[in-house]
Amino acid sequence: MRNKYIESFEKAQLENRNIPEFRAGDTVKVAVRIKEGSKERVQNYEGLCIAIRGQGTGRTFMVRKMGANSVGVERIFPLYSDSIESIEVLRKGRVRRAKLFYLRELKGKAARIKELRRK
């Protein structure tokens, strides 16, 4: 059971956010604001969403991309972070699991996810 004051505060925080609907298995592009000294830039991080966890303002999602030399790079993003400028869903994946950690052991074409066909 959650505190009603915390729930009302979180509800006010979540109202003004424009976050698309996505699930584990979807390919997403996350535009992250990075501050380097006095400069600020936006870096795109594109990969497969392999997990979503938490609730309310503490909700996070994990994105896995294949880096150089076929090395997998995973990054955890807070969903309602101010450093996230935008989230774009590129592909909807067809999976039957909520957490896709089994993809860590797969390599090459075996690690692909089928695209969800729209009716």
Curated annotation (Swiss-Prot):
UniProt keyword Ribosomal protein, yes or no: yes
One example of a Gene Ontology biological process annotation: translation
One of the record's GO cellular component terms: cytosolic large ribosomal subunit
Keyword Ribonucleoprotein in annotation: yes
Pfam families in the cross-refs: Ribosomal_L19
Keywords of the record: Ribonucleoprotein, Ribosomal protein
Alphabetized Gene3D superfamilies for the sequence: 2.30.30.790
InterPro entries: Ribosomal_bL19, Ribosomal_bL19_CS, Ribosomal_bL19_sf, Translation_prot_SH3-like_sf
GO molecular function: structural constituent of ribosome
NCBIfam families, per database record: rplS_bact
Similarity remark: Belongs to the bacterial ribosomal protein bL19 family.
Cited function: This protein is located at the 30S-50S ribosomal subunit interface and may play a role in the structure and function of the aminoacyl-tRNA binding site.
Entry-linked HAMAP family: Ribosomal_bL19
Protein name: Large ribosomal subunit protein bL19
Naturally occurring in which organism (per UniProt): Sulfurovum sp. (strain NBC37-1)
